[in-house]
Amino acid sequence: MNIMRTAMLLAFMTALFMGVGYLVGGGSGMVIALLMASGLNFFSYWNSDKIVLRMYGAREVDRHSSPVYYKIVSDLAKKASLPQPKVYVIDNAQPNAFATGRNPQNAAVAASTGLLERLSAEEVAGVMAHELAHIEHRDTLTMTLTATIAGAISMLGNFAFFMGGQRSSSEDSHGAGAIGGFIALLVAPFAAMLVQMAISRTREYAADRRGAEICGNPLWLASALRKIADGGHGVYNEEAEHNPATAHLFIINPLSGEGADSLFSTHPATANRIAALYRQAEEMKGALAESGGWNEEGGMNKKSNDEMNYGDFRGGQAYVPGEQENSTFQRVTKRPSWLRYDNSKKSRS
């Protein structure tokens, strides 16, 4: 399904380029546009993930620089039977995250410092499980290509206007090129919106559900979405505002003023996603009650900050945060075994 969706997306982009090329340059313009589209599609397939990561200044981290964050991603990938993705941190106060890559073997996940600072380890696990679900569903290729292609489409108006102006100077065109350029200038933004809408919003619901299955508790992701939504739109994300074509990559729309569910939204309404996760938690209520994640009132158990300590990450050892993890991860007790460091035996010997 995603292979067909990707093929349709690339075909649409090629047709769009050729149509604009023909509009402003006739047959020769269409040929030039075809060559340009083919080159862009080829380049985007191999490099769009690198472009997006570089666009947001993402820096790769490992088990030494960010041991807790890296371990969460690593353990979740094992639980989902996925290859270990590359792990990145984005220096941005807005809590958010995304996944990218052309396939599971060449995938990466990125979380902002704002997300790591605001969320508990359980909530971070819920977010990362959601992103790994996108990788498992192979959404990441389509999502990343869409971001690159939609950005390119936004440039078509200027390209068409310039080419139209050149063509209008010929006697045969009699000003038709300028008119064609103006039409293309109007059509290009709408076409960019259509490309973004080519990625169905239902993929977010599917990734939420599968992510909850991977991490084992829908309430972790529900709590994370609420925190991200509450804190996200109040923090200006300069990179996202300058590159709105990438908004659909994130777990929650990073653009200011977004959040309501509508026909042209890149994401479902956060409240609807949380409601779906609570319904999923009801389905899993028995298993969650045994793990201590669900109380008798049908909500997530809360723990006081006084009970929280990093020792739970390492079987009782005092945990020293990595360079990228100072002041991150609210401390939470009673973590499942996979969410802890498992070298406690060594520490007691």
UniProtKB/Swiss-Prot annotation:
UniProt xrefs under Pfam families: Peptidase_M48
Active site (UniProt): 131
UniProt keyword annotation of Cell membrane present: yes
CDD domains: M48B_HtpX_like
Keyword line: Cell inner membrane, Cell membrane, Hydrolase, Membrane, Metal-binding, Metalloprotease, Protease, Transmembrane, Transmembrane helix, Zinc
GO BP, one annotated term: proteolysis
Entry's cofactor comment: Binds 1 zinc ion per subunit.
Subcellular location: Cell inner membrane
UniProt keyword DNA-binding present: no
Top-level lineage group: Bacteria
Cofactor or coenzyme needed: Zn(2+)
Membrane topology, from the record: Multi-pass membrane protein
Family: Belongs to the peptidase M48B family.
Protein name listed in UniProt: Protease HtpX homolog
Lineage: Bacteria, Pseudomonadati, Pseudomonadota, Alphaproteobacteria, Hyphomicrobiales
